């Protein structure tokens, strides 16, 4: 196996061309024949489907009870305004959600720049037009922003807590990546001419740097394939019913997350030894940990998100008896 790996060429990063803050072209070569399409297609699919971002998920407009309304003095109807709100490229730096407001009197053109931001929020396309107001018209609304991955359809919940009259749910496209294309060209190393060169072109909405998007996509691909590196048959052990209640990932030690030494030591100081211990902690609770700042917290959240996990998860009957017995041994 080692001999085969040594025979394969190891690609190197040849060039990173930044077209602008939204667009980058990355060139990778040399690749063995066929690897250009293999890696290019895998990275493209991950970039389009699995990059975290933020989006407006709810809007509450003064005087509007449902999305089929019209607002006096406003050129656009409510449905058009909602479609425009979906195009706002918004970035949350630390928090996972935010409440924003917008208030404007006519005559005026309402743009994304009119949204009143807090210290944690940025808008990357402030010139985006949301509505046109005539003389005497007024538009006032509250907006809810959340972080997420991929696409989430608007669901009008029947729960009393979220079924408030006038709360308009929006379909949310959280992905900051707008387009991804790749090109495979011929490459040459000495006498070999049957090699690939991969050119990856990524365009984002500005909330995520294109180069960072490629790095994150490669990290996601790495974690999805790592289980195949040490592929072994594992004997299925019949455990008590209590043990089966938990996903095996919760029983893994936090060391498996490969956090920085600083973050790992902070967690151990708080007696957080397993992933199941960690996901039950709230952000506010972790921020009270000595020497664990916002940067370390973001690292923890990003690593958990790569595994489909998040903080503030409630696990009934935790910890299982097997972990309790191990810790007391």
Swiss-Prot record:
GO terms for molecular function: DNA binding; DNA-directed RNA polymerase activity; protein dimerization activity. InterPro entries: DNA-dir_RNA_pol_insert, DNA-dir_RNA_pol_RpoA/D/Rpb3, DNA-dir_RpoA, RBP11-like, RNAP_asu_C, RNApol_insert_sf. Residues 1-232 are annotated as: Alpha N-terminal domain (alpha-NTD). Keywords: DNA-directed RNA polymerase, Nucleotidyltransferase, Transcription, Transferase. Its EC number is 2.7.7.6. Pfam families: RNA_pol_A_bac (PF01000), RNA_pol_A_CTD (PF03118), RNA_pol_L (PF01193). GO terms for biological process: DNA-templated transcription. SMART domains: RPOLD. The keyword Transferase applies. Residues 246-329 are annotated as: Alpha C-terminal domain (alpha-CTD). Gene3D superfamilies: 5' to 3' exonuclease, C-terminal subdomain, DNA-directed RNA polymerase, insert domain, RNA polymerase, RBP11-like subunit. Belongs to the RNA polymerase alpha chain family. DNA-dependent RNA polymerase catalyzes the transcription of DNA into RNA using the four ribonucleoside triphosphates as substrates. The N-terminal domain is essential for RNAP assembly and basal transcription, whereas the C-terminal domain is involved in interaction with transcriptional regulators and with upstream promoter elements. Homodimer. The RNAP catalytic core consists of 2 alpha, 1 beta, 1 beta' and 1 omega subunit. When a sigma factor is associated with the core the holoenzyme is formed, which can initiate transcription. This is DNA-directed RNA polymerase subunit alpha.
